[in-house]
Amino acid sequence: MAIPNRSTYVIVGAGIHGLSTAYHLALELKSRGIGSGKDIIVLDKTGVCAGASGIACGVIRNNYYQSSMRELMAHSVKVWESDPQAYSYHPVGYMQVSCERMHSDVATIYQQQQAIGYQSTFVEGKADCERYMKGIFGDWQAQGITSVLHEMPGGYSNNTRAMLALAAKAEGEGVQIFSGVEVTGFSRDNAGSISAIETSRGVIESDYVVIAAGPWAGKFWDMLEMPATISIKSPTDGSIANDVPMWVYWSLQEGTLGVDPNMQVSNDGT
């Protein structure tokens, strides 16, 4: 398939963020009557879910400490629930089983969940936690547990299947996905705005560019000549930390374990 030399929207990265942006943008353009998925292309230097989205754990949860994310995560869980078969989504819920050191933080998460009507159960105290866990796993043996946060929505997804389904949904709306296309640079107009994307297969003019490159975001940050360091204001005392590196990468290795499917079955057989 020939790559167009112009597209209103260009999305860089065919992982969860890039494909989700493409699909939902296509739906929004159509619903407003101002365009369609045909106005969108997605570029990836390898292919759909070739990066982090293809090896991530696939857990779907609303268990984050930042309160600003709470409603966004609740919304996202509903998206997974909207088509569980296509997204290979298993709504088994999510549990955070914690020691005392994490008790207060987890309690805060629970309070934030209740404030937006997100269904969850919070159990406190060693005896009650042990009783609750043994009600699910009769052979539960973990010690030192003082809190259990049990989210009823959520679960996990087989991520590669989910990404392929999401790509198909986007393409069904007219989005074009191009694999094996590496972005090498950007062109700017006289006002300094990005006007075109330079790729290994030619230049593409565009009105809007979305960078959804996951772990490669730092590379594009450098391409755009953005600052290597930033200043951050402390939320507690207002002090300013200067020259903080914009990007710090940690090494995380994930994989798949082959286990007996009957291992760790709950009391009700699930």
Report the location of each language-model feature.
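A short, basic/flexible loop-to-alpha-helix module at the beginning of a structural domain
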Residues: 1-6
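N-terminal Rossmann-like FAD-binding beta1-loop-alpha1 element of flavoenzymes
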Residues: 7-41
